[in-house]
């Protein structure tokens, strides 16, 4: 029978940007924007407290995504607590393509393991990542949220895999976040069931180039971030996003739709302040770096 730890545990989880242009459902970056969450075992009941981004739109019951992830992780380890308190301080914008749902899922599984004494013996990092990717349905945001940095991920023989790669320290980014979100299910629903072979081949080549560009040859980022498979296809749901991507790219800036959108992510040199002028009225801009740390327990 598992023993639960006394007192609260806290975790910090980064925002993520997936796809990065051609790396659809396979490439992702952790970014320097973090949610912080705290949980503790109670004698009974469930208390969910939320502040910050998206606080008005999330439930305070068992349907809360972090709680669902925690329950799944507790099931994996064979023990449910008698009661739970969860406190979320959200910074990552919701429904904007910056991995808020993956951050919630990763936070949940990490918190659950930390609440069980010897939890590392009951669930390895690989097992938690597998569970988190199962819950999300694709690994490209979950992997960098869990492991940090730049991660190449996918599924092989029924299991998820994630491979970290170093990122050139010269690379920084800016996120242009629109005031209204687009649900991932809507953005994915616009994608065709099949694509021309030539487009798939072109994307494969650019995805390979993107790995080289991010890991040490950033001069190739503009060419490496071109996409044929998903960005233009989503224009109906986010026309202003695609207009900004095209305008930035025409000016030589490597810009992409972040995840399923509608945020735009643009890569820059060490200083991205010059890119702030491109921020549309009413949008928020975040100067970001690649976050080498993934989900981190706080003391």
Predicted regions, residues:
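Active-site rim beta-loop-alpha module in soluble metabolic enzymes
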Residues: 175-236
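Alpha/beta catalytic cores of group-transfer enzymes, especially the acyltransferase/condensing modules
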Residues: 123-171, 242, 248, 255-256, ...
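DPxDG-like acidic metal-binding loop motif
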Residues: 33, 98-121, 146-148
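Glycine-rich, charge-dense phosphate/pyrophosphate-binding loop(s)
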Residues: 213-299
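Short beta-strand-to-turn element immediately C-terminal to the catalytic PLP-Schiff-base lysine
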Residues: 40, 145-147, 151-156, 215, ...
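Short beta-strand segments
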Residues: 12-14, 145-147, 154, 175-179, ...
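ATP-binding N-lobe of GHMP and related small-molecule kinases
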Residues: 1-96, 113-114, 121-123, 288-299
């Amino acid at each position: 029978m598992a023993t639960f730890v006394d007192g609260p545990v806290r975790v910090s989880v980064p925002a993520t940007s997936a796809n990065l242009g051609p790396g659809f459902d396979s490439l992702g970056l952790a970014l320097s924007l973090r949610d912080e969450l705290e949980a503790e075992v109670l004698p009974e009941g469930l208390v969910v407290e939320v502040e910050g981004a998206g606080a008005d739109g999330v439930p305070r019951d068992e349907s809360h995504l972090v709680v669902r992830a925690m329950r799944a992780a507790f099931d994996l380890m064979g023990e449910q607590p008698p009661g739970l308190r969860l406190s979320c301080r959200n910074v990552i914008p919701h429904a904007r393509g910056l991995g808020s749902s993956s951050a919630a899922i990763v936070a949940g599984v990490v918190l659950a393991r930390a609440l069980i004494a010897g939890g590392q013996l009951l669930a390895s990092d690989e097992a938690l990542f597998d569970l988190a990717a199962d819950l999300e349905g694709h690994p490209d945001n979950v992997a960098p949220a869990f492991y940090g940095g730049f991660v190449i991920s996918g599924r092989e023989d029924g299991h998820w895999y994630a491979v970290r790669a170093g990122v050139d320290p010269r690379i920084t980014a800016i996120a242009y976040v629109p005031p209204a979100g687009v649900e991932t299910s809507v953005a994915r629903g616009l994608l065709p069931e099949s694509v021309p072979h030539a487009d798939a081949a072109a994307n494969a080549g650019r995805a390979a180039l993107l790995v080289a560009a991010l890991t040490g040859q950033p001069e190739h980022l503009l060419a490496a971030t071109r996409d044929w498979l998903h960005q233009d296809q989503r224009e109906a749901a986010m026309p202003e996003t695609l207009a900004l991507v095209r305008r930035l790219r025409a000016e030589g800036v490597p810009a992409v739709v972040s995840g399923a959108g509608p945020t735009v992510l643009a890569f820059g040199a060490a200083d991205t302040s010059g890119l702030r002028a491109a921020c549309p009225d009413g949008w928020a801009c975040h100067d970001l770096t690649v976050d080498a740390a993934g989900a981190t327990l706080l003391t």
